[in-house]
Amino acid sequence: ANVFKAKANIKARRIWLVFSLLLTANYGTDAANGIYPKSSYIIFVALCWIPFFIGELFFRIKGKATDAYRLCLVIGYGIFYTFVICTTDSPISFTYILPVMSLLVLYKNKKFMINCGIANVLSVIVSDVYRYVVLGCRSDADMKNYQLQVACLLLCYICYVMSIRHLNESDGALNGSIKAD
């Protein structure tokens, strides 16, 4: 079991690293071109990389199979993600969570995935309320985007939970057939 936890953590770390590199480069280019203030980019970089390196410390101190890593990933990336969706103009920024969250299926923990889904949807709702109230993004297109963001995330998490349920059932059936032999 620890071998599979370690493999899941390593795969999650790789995706977190790749996505952090991509977003850092993308937002760095935008900041250099004046799209975002440099002060926002500094906050962006800190929120992106500090949690990643804290996760690295967990790996070194507690080992690659530690359950603490997935919590570090979810909390650290979640804070970073919430900052991004509140500060970017892109209506598709809510999807930046999907590559990382889709890997959480590897942990095959339905309750954990449901809790992540609730937290993710709440962060998008907070962002949408912020954009509506503070930034004044109230057009019909904005309202449609808000609805589609929440609906898309809910459907993704429903599919993630269904996938986990299926994986757990198939593992149980496989284990049962092995025991029967």
Task: Please report, for each region that a protein language model flagged, where it lies by residue.
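Residue-level signature of transmembrane alpha-helical entry/exit and packing/kink sites
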Residues: 66, 70, 74, 94, ...
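Interfacial aromatic-anchored transmembrane helix boundaries in multi-pass membrane proteins
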Residues: 82-89, 124-149
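Membrane-embedded alpha-helical segments of multi-pass transporters/permeases
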Residues: 28, 53-57, 125-129, 157-161
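HAMP domain helices
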Residues: 142-154, 158-181
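Transmembrane helix interruption/hinge and helix-loop junction motifs
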Residues: 86-91, 108-111
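Alpha-helical transmembrane segments and their helix-entry boundary regions
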Residues: 66, 105, 112-117
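Short, Lys/Arg-rich, polar N-terminal cytosolic tail immediately upstream
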Residues: 1-6
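Hydrophobic transmembrane alpha-helices and their membrane-interface boundaries in multi-pass
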Residues: 12-89, 96-102, 120-121
